[in-house]
Amino acid sequence: MCIRDSDKPEERADYYKRIKDLEREGDKLTHLILDELGTTFITPFDREDIHALASTMDDVIDGINSCAKRINIYNPRPISDSGKELSRLIQQEAVYIGKAMDELETFRQKPAALRGYCNKLHDIENQADDVYEHFITKLFEEEKDCIELIKIKEIMHELEKTTDVAEQVGKILKNLIIKYA
């Protein structure tokens, strides 16, 4: 959102504040889940799996927040189409993670839908790798301002890492399918 919707510093600051607020809400939910794990006798699946899933989903939100923070602090030139594409891919991953969560109640009886969302997360992460590699090659060939190069490279690297973490959510979910289906 911070990348795709604005190249103006004041709007970036507003987006960053909104993203930071959402990240804090995510932290609260993660802590609530982890606290409940310690007091709940029966869980829908292993505590370790719930812990891994909640923590990794929180890491996705943390990655998005980290990207927005870097954009706000570094104030780079307008983000390239590659940055906007990585942002779009992260948004797609978030949608598929949400859809995957909706499948958790029934995945033991019908694992195909959950498996499909996990595969989508993997495919999107592969697309993100391609976008990132192409962008980095072009950045080092074309960018002459060393400071700008460092700022943009850090932001793009953080975006790409966030797609990796979202894929990890899919891997955790696939392990649940294997374990329980």
Give, region by region, the residue ranges found by the protein language model.
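Long amphipathic all-alpha helical oligomerization modules
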Residues: 109-181
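Hydrophobic/aromatic-rich structural module bridging two neighboring secondary-structure elements via a short loop
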Residues: 12-22, 29-62
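Long amphipathic alpha-helical coiled-coil segments
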Residues: 41-49, 74-88, 141-152, 175-181
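Conserved small/polar residues in nucleotide/adenosyl-binding loops
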Residues: 1-5
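Charged, well-structured binding/catalytic surfaces in domain cores that contact anionic ligands
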Residues: 56-138
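Heptad-repeat coiled-coil alpha-helices
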Residues: 8, 35, 39-42, 73, ...
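Internal glycine-rich alpha/beta core junctions
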Residues: 22-25, 124
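Short, charged, amphipathic alpha-helical segments
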Residues: 13-21, 47, 51, 81-84, ...
